[in-house]
């Protein structure tokens, strides 16, 4: 019957839109992750060089490096996976093997030269979100560098700003990126720095990832999907007229 065919075509159109939005969000997420990883690894390599040049280490020297590179933490881990020097006093003697997040770095004692993690809650301070990278030291062990959410976002905002401005989803769909304060950092209408909700008209609070919802965005009835990475919300938007047009083709 007509209604059955219409319903089937509608479901297929929604499915196609869902697949396309997922693909575009994953693409942007990969770009943000790459920029984030590259940024912290570059800082960590530079700090490693200075640590190598210093030879003997003490907390005062690490604190100077902390200030110079404007990071949140620097720790030295020995060949047994124990923190033997750190800008954060409570980390002294911490066994990296004792936490889910921290033990990932033990591969650096086994032939891996460097590692960078996603932005996440840390083992030693539950509820505190950090991003860490580490690079091996020539004398054994490794140096680990971390920065907190404020430092992380300030650094990465510059790389993410405008990232999706010229990316289209289909013909007239587009991508938005908001930071963890729900302010736009990438928007095709050049509203970076403004409120995600007040500016775009989105009503549904950012919630479950990959859920397809129907919203009015910039005055147009649209399908919307969210993705999250490194403290950023990636929002894919496709106008309903394009979804319906695709169904009628």
Q: Residue spans of the language-model regions?
A:
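Juxtamembrane amphipathic/coiled-coil helical coupling segments that flank
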Residues: 12-21, 35-36, 152-164, 240-247
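Short, hydrophobic beta-strand elements of compact beta-sandwich sensory domains
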Residues: 132-152, 223-248
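Amphipathic coiled-coil signal-relay and dimerization helices
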Residues: 82-89, 131-133, 182-190, 225-226
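Juxtamembrane extracytoplasmic/periplasmic/luminal helical "stalk" adjacent to the first N-terminal
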Residues: 1-57, 129-133, 165-174, 180
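Extracytoplasmic/periplasmic sensor domains and loops in membrane signaling proteins
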Residues: 59-61, 88-122, 155-163, 188-218
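Generic short beta-strand
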Residues: 74, 175, 213-214
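Solvent-exposed, extracytoplasmic
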Residues: 54-71, 138-140, 147-185
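Extracellular/periplasmic ligand-binding regions of membrane signal-transduction receptors
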Residues: 18-59, 79-91, 140-141, 147-157, ...
């Amino acid at each position: 019957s007509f209604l059955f065919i219409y319903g089937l075509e509608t479901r297929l159109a929604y499915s196609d839109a869902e697949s396309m939005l997922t693909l575009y969000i994953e693409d942007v997420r990969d770009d943000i992750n790459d920029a984030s990883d590259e940024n912290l690894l570059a800082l960590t390599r530079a700090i490693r060089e200075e640590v190598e040049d210093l030879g003997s280490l003490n907390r005062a020297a690490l604190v100077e490096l902390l200030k110079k590179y404007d990071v949140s933490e620097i720790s030295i881990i020995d060949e047994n996976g124990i923190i033997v020097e750190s800008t954060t006093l409570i980390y002294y003697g911490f066994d990296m093997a004792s936490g889910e997040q921290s033990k990932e770095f033990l591969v650096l004692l086994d032939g891996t030269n460097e590692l960078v993690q996603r932005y996440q809650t840390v083992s030693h301070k539950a509820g505190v979100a950090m991003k860490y990278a580490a690079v091996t030291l020539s004398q054994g062990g490794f140096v680990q560098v971390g920065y907190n959410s404020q430092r992380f976002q300030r650094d990465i905002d510059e790389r993410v700003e405008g990232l999706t401005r010229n990316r289209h989803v289909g013909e007239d769909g587009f991508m938005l990126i908001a930071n963890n304060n729900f302010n736009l950092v990438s928007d095709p209408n050049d509203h970076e720095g403004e409120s995600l909700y007040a500016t775009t008209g989105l009503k549904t609070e950012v919630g479950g990832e990959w859920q397809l919802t129907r919203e009015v965005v910039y005055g147009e009835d649209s399908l919307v999907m969210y993705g999250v990475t490194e403290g950023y919300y990636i929002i894919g938007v496709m106008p309903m007229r394009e979804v319906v047009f695709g169904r009628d083709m």
